[in-house]
Amino acid sequence: MVSEVSRWFRISLLNLAIVAFIGVLLRYKIAFSLPFLDQHYLLHGHSHFAFAGWITQALMTLMVSYLFVSGQTSAFKKYRNLLVLNLITAYGMVISFPLQGYGFFAIVFSTLSIFVSYGFAFSFWKDLNELKDERISKWWFKGSLIFSVISSIGPFSLSYMMASDNLHEKWYLASIYFFLHFQYNGWFFFACMGLLVHRLELMGIHLDIFKKSFLYFFAACIPAYFLSVLWIPIHTIIYLIVIISALVQMYGWILFLKLIRANIEKLKINLSK
């Protein structure tokens, strides 16, 4: 299994190197002319590939390894097709976006990428339910899958506005920020926390306080979206809910830091091995 995880994770790291290289090109074009590359198109390719080819690919790999160490020994065989499909859509986007922007092939690959994420969410949720023991890490992973699916509302609403020729700047930005918020603060954050909590579980750290921390972060994630669009006129009640969600997130972090502080010596010993 180690070689399987290593193989897939090396691909993710290779994709990170590609992300970094494109980032260098983007900065190079600020000072020097590369007329055969459109800055705006290249930026789209960079961002889409960073999300799908680097972060999502890495998280999927690590989450599948979680299933493996939890007793599902055929996990990588089962998820191989989804991991390959995610790579295909990611490479498709990093090629098509710089060439045509939001053209036909770029839209096809980005749409397929969303459907791959649906497939992963559905399969992984089912496999989590097959783990009979009650682990707090399962909560975080399920939260990440929920927000991964929710985030797709952003690009689909954007596609609808473009197709109906009803594109308004505020709604355009709101759709983009919707996707970004539920990717960063939902899918990415909750998946990373799930991996961290799993590591703490393996160390034998008592994690009951993490149940509360999860509930606070999960409850605050949806209303916290409005922190990204405060320039849109919103009702005073919604504004108050947004403030409360920020405070709830802060309290969730306090609970997390209290747990880390209470187990700092055990963490030092285990992480130094």
Annotated model-derived regions:
Residues 1-273:
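Hydrophobic alpha-helical transmembrane segments of multi-pass integral membrane proteins
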